[in-house]
Every structure is written in C-alpha cells, then in structure tokens.
Regions:
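Gly/Ser/Thr-rich phosphate-binding loop
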Residues: 183, 290-298, 307-371, 384, ...
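AMP-binding/adenylate-forming catalytic core of the ANL superfamily
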Residues: 66-72, 83-85, 296, 407, ...
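Structural core segment of the AMP-binding/adenylate-forming
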Residues: 26-27, 57-180, 502-504
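Conserved AMP-binding/adenylate-forming core of the ANL superfamily
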Residues: 1-42, 46, 50, 67-72, ...
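Conserved structural elements of the adenylate-forming
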Residues: 14-19, 188, 202, 207, ...
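AMP-binding/adenylate-forming core of the ANL superfamily
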Residues: 386, 397-411, 430, 436-437
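Conserved pre-ATP/AMP-binding loop-to-beta segment of ANL
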Residues: 157-161, 165-166, 171-210, 217, ...
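Conserved AMP-binding/adenylation subdomain of ANL enzymes
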Residues: 229-246, 254-295, 309
Length: 550
C-alpha cells in the first residue's frame, strides 16, 4: 500500500486492521451492526472499513459527494451505530455539514420510523436469502440506541449513531479522534479479535451499498461476504490481475468499482494499492510514472483525459498493461488509442450494478477491439442473463429488452424495503436491472439504455446510449449525452449535450448535418447544446436528470 511517503507491507496492513477491529469491539460493535465510512480514498478508509468488517460489522460506505442531508439520510436509513468521517475534504467540513443536517427534524425525509426490535433481515422480498443479521441482533442494536432517545447521541436527529470517529488528529466535542478510537482497543486481546473474525459466516452480509439514486432516493443493496469474494475472484481472474501489479485506485472506495474491484481484488491477488483521493489528470500521470503503475480501471472519460492531455508525452506510461472500463459509452477509437498509442496489452469493458455485486458481464482478454467497444462482454461464470419483454419472456438474440440477471451475486434484497425488493427480484430469483440490452449470437451483451431514458420519436424507440455511441464517432466530439425533449409533431425528439475537443469550432448545425448522414432520421438530435463538461456521479454515469432540468 502506497500513500504519499507512507509505504506499508501486507503484514503491516494486517496489523493495523486488527487494531481497528479491536477498537470496534471495544466500542461495543456487535456482529450485524452497521458501521459507515464517509471519507475519500485513503489508507485510513481501508483500515477503518476492514477493521469494522473484521469485527463482524456490516459496512455502509457513504458517497464523498454527498451533502450533509444526503449522508444523514443513509445513516438514518441504515441505522448505523458508528461513523468514520474525514475532517475536511475539498474545502468542505464533512463534520460541520453533517452536524447541521442531523439537527433537522426526522420527519421530512420520507423514512418510516424503525422502532426497537425491528428485524434487520426480515421482509427483504421473495426469492432471496437472509438479510442483515438476525432479528435478535437488530433488536439489541436498536434497543441500545433507542434507550438514549432521539437527539441524545453525538448528533441530534441520529439516535442510533452512538459514536462518530473523525479520521484526523482533532475532533469536536462528543466526537472521537482516530488516535483515541484506536487506543480504546489496546486492551482487547488479539485472540478475541481473531475469534470474532473467524466466526463470520460466508452468508452473513458484508456491506450495504446504497445505489447512486440517479432516478430517486438511494436504496441499500445487501451483499454477503461469499458473494463479494466470489465475484472479485472471478473479476481478478478475467482481468488478469496478478501478484506484483501496481494498481492506481482512482475509482472511489464508496463505490463497488473502487472498494471491491480495487481493495478486495488487490488483497486477494497481492497487488500493491496506490489510492488517489481525487481524479486529477496531472496527478494521475505523475503517479503512473513515479509508482510504475500497471493497472488503471476507471470510466472512459478518465482514460480519454489521459490520452488527450498535452503533457502526456512528458510522462513514462510504459508500465501500464491493464485497463478495465465501463459505466458509460466506450468509443471504439478509445480502445484503439489505448492499445495503439499507450501500448496497453489488455483493455476490457464490463457491466454491473450494485444489486448484482457490481459485476454481471465482462469481456475476455483476446477479444477484438470491436467487441470490447460495442459490448460489455459475456456473462461471468455462474451467471445467467435473460433479455426479457414486457411480460418477462425471453427474447432472441438481436432483440432489445430489459436485462434480467440470475446467479450467485444477486443481492439478498434492499435493506428493509420488501416492496422495492419484490419489484426488483422475481419470485424465482431473477433481478430486473432496469437496463435495456441486446445479446449478440456470441452471448455478448450490449447495453442500449436505461428503460426510463428511452424516448419515442414518431413511434420509433430511440435509445440515447446508441445515439451517443454514434455521435462519439465524430472527430470533434470529446463527450456527449442525449436526452428526450418534447416535440409538438413527433412527441419527443433527441437533444444532445456535447463537449467539443480542444480547438474545435464545430457548430450545432454541423453536428446535426453530420448526424443526418450517419444515422437513421429518428435518431438524429434536433437540438445540440455545447457544454464544458457533463454532470456525472462518482461512478462516471451521466446525471441525465440534471440535463433534463436545464
């Protein structure tokens, strides 16, 4: 593990994690309790998170882009007992913003009160396994918190949150510093920590990943230890991650791509972790050269920015050998440039979602560039994919429908949300993803869009992702997103929000004229707006609701 001048071995990391686990036990954390982490990609995130999990807790990662109100929502929804939080990040005091948000009344967030004795693992929906802990465990945690009464913990309005640990040397009154927290576990014998870790069952929940909420309030997908380990052993094998690799982890730890395809994959394969708290092209280029980085997963925009950086030639990027990307349209030209200009041996695309452990399909090493760019690869071992019509019936290859997934990685359910779970998972265990896709004869999956993003132009179904892929072929387009807008004659038409390449003088009329030559008429955007950048969430997905609201 490398963080600036700090370099620690796996043995040293293990010792730090055990100490954090001892501190969690000393703080009263019991198996099944939820522990949240709200911090950027740092060594302290890794140690605090793995320490909590080793103590039997269920990890609840919080998005670093959250405001205080959003963080408080997840903390209330999960009833987290312990929170690890960074002090100040990117000029924002997380502690202050959370304190302000937690002081508001509880009734305005649409949550149902969860009284003492509520079984955390009950009612997650049909066709799914056990949820988070047992009813007794949940009752114990809730009774402890409930005895304090609303607003009597360190943060008013978060009665279940008993302790807040600031990952810094200083902490406000009623909070604890990281140093003080760790010292609290020094009296816990190492054997106690190891017994606690050894008692964790494979089918026990390891984490609750709250979905990005691009279409509504976040919901928590419950994933088990066995699911996480099996998924990312498969991911590591298909990607070719190996001992000795040096992995620049730019994907945020609060996201499956950073936590599981990053931290867990490195731990299982013995790769060196080099976390980067914020993506900055100059910093990434410097890190790749200085740390001899060999592995760099991330969204397509990350790799595009590296390729287009004017100072790229001043950095030695020759050690890069593996790129895994996805979460957005991947232009064929991007794959070709990564292979041709940077000589990266393995460039792969993949598809996944939190509700399926973050991985469903993946290209294979040796796939041609056209397959890697145009599809997200084939189902991982142990997974079945169905392209379903509106009645749930399987469609043949080449026809678009909703992607359904069945396999070892499908979530146990949404945390304490039986109605939403029943909507997402069929009684026989199929997960409805909400994504529109097509399977080719070789079993490769092409995601054409979200069902809710599709719009209808004069009776024709228009899929923004397909149109974006075509627009991305224009030599002056660096990034693009398409949404449907009302039209008095056709019902809806497409509008493109485009980012021009540096130095381009491309006009809206130019792009529309080009589109008429390159795609069917109903796909042609009727309006184009050029922007400096597209709004994206931390996983790289375009926030189309923000574009529609403009």
């Amino acid at each position: 593990m490398v963080e600036g001048r700090t370099r620690i071995t796996y043995g040293q990391l293990g010792a730090r994690v055990e100490r954090a686990a001892a501190a969690a036990i000393a703080a009263g954390i019991e198996p099944g309790d939820r522990v949240a982490v709200w911090a950027p990609n740092t060594l302290d995130w890794i140690v605090s998170a793995l320490g909590a999990v080793s103590a039997g807790a269920v990890l609840v990662p919080l998005n670093t882009r959250f405001k205080g109100t959003e963080a408080a929502y997840v903390l209330r929804r999960s009833r987290a007992r312990l929170l690890f939080v960074t002090g100040t990040f990117l000029g924002t005091s997380y502690v202050a913003s959370l304190r302000r948000a937690a002081g508001h009344a509880l009734d305005g967030d649409g949550l149902e009160a969860a009284g003492p004795g509520t079984g955390v693992g009950t009612g997650v929906g049909p066709g799914v396994g056990p949820g988070v802990g047992t009813g007794a465990e949940a009752a114990g945690a809730d009774t402890r918190a409930g005895a304090r009464g609303p607003g009597r913990g360190p943060l008013p309005g978060l009665p279940h949150l008993e302790q807040v640990v600031v990952l810094a040397d200083d902490a406000p009154a009623d909070f604890r510093t990281w140093k003080d927290f760790l010292a609290g576990g020094d009296a816990v014998p190492a054997e106690t920590v190891r017994r606690r870790a050894a008692a964790i069952r494979p089918e026990a929940p390891s984490d609750i990943i709250f979905t990005s909420g691009t279409t509504g309030s976040p919901k928590g997908a419950v994933i088990t230890h066995a699911q996480s380990l099996r998924c990312y052993e498969v991911w590591s094998e298909l990607a070719g991650l190996r001992e000795g690799d040096r992995y620049l982890i730019v994907n945020p730890f609060f996201h499956t791509f950073g936590y599981k395809a990053g931290i867990l994959a490195c731990l299982m394969r013995g790769a060196t972790m080099v976390p980067q708290p914020v993506f900055n092209v100059d910093t990434a280029l410097a890190n790749i050269a200085a740390e001899r980085i060999s592995v760099l997963p991330g969204p397509p925009t990350l790799h595009q920015s590296l390729l287009d950086h004017p100072q790229r030639g001043h950095h030695d990027l020759s050690t890069l050998r593996l790129v895994v990307t996805g979460a957005a349209v991947v232009p064929l030209r991007l794959v070709e440039r990564l292979r041709g200009e940077l000589h990266i041996a393995t460039v792969l695309t993949a598809y996944g979602l939190s509700e399926a452990g973050g991985i469903v399909t993946m290209c294979r090493r040796g796939d041609p560039a056209e397959v890697i760019a145009a599809t997200s690869g084939r189902a991982i071992p142990g997974t079945r994919i169905r392209i379903a019509d509106g009645d749930g019936k399987a469609l043949p290859a080449g026809e678009a429908g909703e992607v359904w997934v069945s396999g070892h990685h499908v979530m146990q359910g949404y945390f304490e949300a039986p109605a939403e779970t029943a909507e997402a998972i069929t009684p026989d265990g199929w997960l409805r993803t909400g994504d529109v896709g097509v399977l080719d004869p070789g079993g490769n999956l092409r995601i054409t869009d979200r069902i809710k993003d599709m719009f209808i132009v004069g009776g024709f179904n228009a899929y923004p992702a397909e149109i974006e892929q075509l627009l991305g072929l224009h030599p002056d387009i660096a990034d693009v997103a398409v949404v449907g807008i009302p039209d008095p004659r056709l019902g809806e038409v497409g509008k493109a929000y485009a980012v021009r390449r540096p130095g381009s003088t491309l006009t809206a009329d130019d792009l529309i004229a080009w589109s008429r030559r390159e795609m069917a008429n109903y796909k042609v955007p009727r309006a184009v707006e050029f922007v400096a950048e597209l709004p994206r969430n931390a996983s790289g997905k375009v926030l189309k609701r923000e574009l529609r609201a403009r």
